[in-house]
């Protein structure tokens, strides 16, 4: 059985500690992780319900050491992990380092800002920046921006956004 299958299986089953332990064993044997292994290890960090920021930072260090930080899927997953644990500074660093941002990147960054309730204006800013970059909002993006409208009590902006949601066909 390959290390990737072993780590991925444990991550899928929610066996966070075992997945990370196997990852560390793999490294002790001198094996270099690939993209899929790193994705599975990152997902394992969030699999048990509580995301361990120390583990995410450790995995991030491994990603950098193994020169995998330019992989879009890894960057997005790492950004999402930092966002989920409320680590805004690290999320921003990963976001700005991404060479190619897609709708997943933008929504993860919006979730990070929404986790910090006082930063709704940043969600609006990033929404405008995303559209300027030519990225079309999806249901997740609209949800993030609506949440920011609620936090900011931005009723008129919320109404305008609701109209856009209807025009985009996400109202059902």
Language-model features: locations:
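Alpha-helical repeat/alpha-solenoid scaffolds of the HEAT/ARM/MIF4G superfamily
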Residues: 45-53, 66, 76
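Pentatricopeptide repeat
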Residues: 3-4, 8, 19, 30, ...
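Residue-level detector of the short coil/turn that links helix A to helix B
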Residues: 14, 51, 86, 117-118, ...
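Core domains of intracellular innate-immunity/apoptotic signalosomes
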Residues: 15, 25-30, 128-134
């Amino acid at each position: 059985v390959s290390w990737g299958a072993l780590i991925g299986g444990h991550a899928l089953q929610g066996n966070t500690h075992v997945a990370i332990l196997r990852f560390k064993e793999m490294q002790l044997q001198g094996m270099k992780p690939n993209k899929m292994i790193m994705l599975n290890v990152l997902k394992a960090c969030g699999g048990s319900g509580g995301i361990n920021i120390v583990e995410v930072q450790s995995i991030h260090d491994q990603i950098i050491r193994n020169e995998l930080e330019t992989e879009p899927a890894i960057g997005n997953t790492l950004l999402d992990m930092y966002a989920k644990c409320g680590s805004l500074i690290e999320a921003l660093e990963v976001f700005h380092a991404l060479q190619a941002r897609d709708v997943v990147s933008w929504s993860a960054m919006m979730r990070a800002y929404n986790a910090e309730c006082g930063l709704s204006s940043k969600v609006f800013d990033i929404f405008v920046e995303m559209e300027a970059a030519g990225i079309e909002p999806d249901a997740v993006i609209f949800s993030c921006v609506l949440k920011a409208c609620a936090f900011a009590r931005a009723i008129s902006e919320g109404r305008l956004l609701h109209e856009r949601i209807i025009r985009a066909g996400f109202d059902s």
